[in-house]
C-alpha cells in the first residue's frame, strides 16, 4: 500500500467494487429514473430507482424468483428469465406512471447479447422508454430459449436427463421451453 502525503484513498464503495461513481454521476445528472439490472449467480433483479437527498428510493422492483410464482419452470438466471424479469419490471413501472429510465448495469462489462441487455429488451418491449442501441440486444430466438431447445434435441435420452435434471424435476422438458416462455409472457400481460 502507498504511503505519504500525496496518497489518495478511493471511496470505500469503489474499493469494495460496488459503485462506479463516475458512471453514477452521469446517470444522476440526467434527472431520469434508473433501470438497475443486477445478475447474481442464481437470480436476476431489475429495479426502477430514483435518486433522493436521503439516498436512493426504489420505485418498482422485479425479481426472477417472482417468475416462479407465476408458473415459470425454467431457470431463474438464464437469458429467458432475465428478459421476463425486465418485462415484469417494465409493466409494473408503466402501471406506476414511470415511462422513462436510463440503464444502470453497475460494474458489469457491457457485452453484446448478455443477460443485462436481455432484461433491457424486456423492459423496452413492455413499453418503457430506455435509450439504447439495437446492436447490443440479444436476438428473439435466444431470448425464447430456442438455442436450449436445439441443444436438448441433439442429446440422447440419457444425456438429456443428466444435463437437464432440474428442468425435468420441475416438469418442463427443455424442448418445450419456447412455448413455456410465451405462456409466461402472456400471463405477465394478464396479471400486471
Swiss-Prot record:
Biological process (GO), any one: ribosomal large subunit assembly
Gene Ontology cellular component terms for the protein in this record: cytosolic large ribosomal subunit
GO molecular function: 5S rRNA binding; structural constituent of ribosome
Keywords: Ribonucleoprotein, Ribosomal protein, RNA-binding, rRNA-binding
Keyword RNA-binding attached: yes
Recorded family membership: Belongs to the universal ribosomal protein uL18 family.
NCBIfam families linked to this entry: PRK08569.1
Protein name stated in the entry: Large ribosomal subunit protein uL18
Source organism: Methanothermobacter thermautotrophicus (strain ATCC 29096 / DSM 1053 / JCM 10044 / NBRC 100330 / Delta H) (Methanobacterium thermoautotrophicum)
Amino acid at each position: 500500500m502507498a504511503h505519504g502525503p500525496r496518497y489518495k484513498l478511493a471511496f470505500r464503495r469503489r474499493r469494495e467494487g460496488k459503485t462506479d461513481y463516475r458512471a453514477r454521476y452521469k446517470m444522476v445528472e440526467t434527472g431520469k429514473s434508473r433501470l438497475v439490472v443486477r445478475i447474481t449467480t442464481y437470480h436476476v433483479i431489475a429495479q426502477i430507482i430514483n435518486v433522493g437527498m436521503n439516498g436512493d428510493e426504489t420505485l418498482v422492483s422485479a425479481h426472477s424468483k417472482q417468475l416462479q410464482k407465476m408458473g415459470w419452470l425454467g431457470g431463474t438466471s438464464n437469458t429467458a428469465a432475465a428478459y421476463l424479469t425486465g418485462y415484469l419490471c417494465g409493466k409494473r413501472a408503466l402501471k406506476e406512471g414511470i415511462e422513462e429510465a436510463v440503464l444502470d448495469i453497475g460494474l458489469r462489462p457491457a457485452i453484446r447479447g448478455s443477460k443485462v441487455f436481455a432484461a433491457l429488451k424486456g423492459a423496452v418491449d413492455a413499453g418503457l422508454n430506455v435509450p439504447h442501441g439495437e446492436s447490443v440486444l440479444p436476438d428473439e430466438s435466444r431470448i425464447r430459449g430456442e438455442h436450449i431447445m436445439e441443444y436438448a434435441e441433439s442429446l440422447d435420452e440419457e444425456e438429456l436427463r443428466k444435463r437437464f435434471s432440474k428442468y425435468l424435476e420441475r416438469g418442463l422438458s427443455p424442448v418445450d421451453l419456447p412455448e413455456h416462455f410465451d405462456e409466461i409472457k402472456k400471463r405477465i400481460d394478464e396479471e400486471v
